[in-house]
């Protein structure tokens, strides 16, 4: 999702997306440790998305 689209979301919707991404990132890490993850870039992409959402949530709360 684009950053502009994320900024238009409500804080509750962003929190739901954040929880989903955190679970997804956890699954990717477990797959990576057990050598089942094919595409390692998924780890970096989810980590970046998590950081973007956290930043937007903090900006909206300030």
From Swiss-Prot:
What name does the UniProt record give this protein? Large ribosomal subunit protein uL29
Give the record's keywords alphabetically. Ribonucleoprotein, Ribosomal protein
GO cellular component terms, semicolon-separated: ribonucleoprotein complex; ribosome
Please name one Pfam family that this protein belongs to. Ribosomal_L29
Looking up Gene3D superfamilies in the UniProt record yields:
1.10.287.310
Q: Name one GO molecular function term.
A: structural constituent of ribosome
Listed NCBIfam families? L29
Biological process terms in GO annotation: translation
Family statement: Belongs to the universal ribosomal protein uL29 family.
- Mind telling me which InterPro entries this protein's record contains? Ribosomal_uL29, Ribosomal_uL29_sf
**HAMAP family from the UniProt entry:** Ribosomal_uL29
What taxonomic classification does the UniProt entry list for its organism? Bacteria, Pseudomonadati, Pseudomonadota, Gammaproteobacteria, Candidatus Pseudothioglobaceae
Q: Which residues cross the membrane?
A: none
The answer, when asked if Ribosomal protein is one of the entry's keywords, is yes
Tell me the organism: Vesicomyosocius okutanii subsp. Calyptogena okutanii (strain HA)
């Amino acid at each position: 999702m684009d950053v502009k689209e994320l900024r238009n979301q409500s804080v509750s919707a962003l929190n739901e997306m954040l929880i989903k991404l955190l679970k997804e990132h956890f699954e990717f890490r477990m797959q990576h440790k057990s050598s089942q993850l094919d595409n390692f870039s998924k780890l970096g992409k989810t980590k970046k998305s998590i950081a973007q959402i956290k930043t937007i949530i903090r900006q909206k709360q300030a």
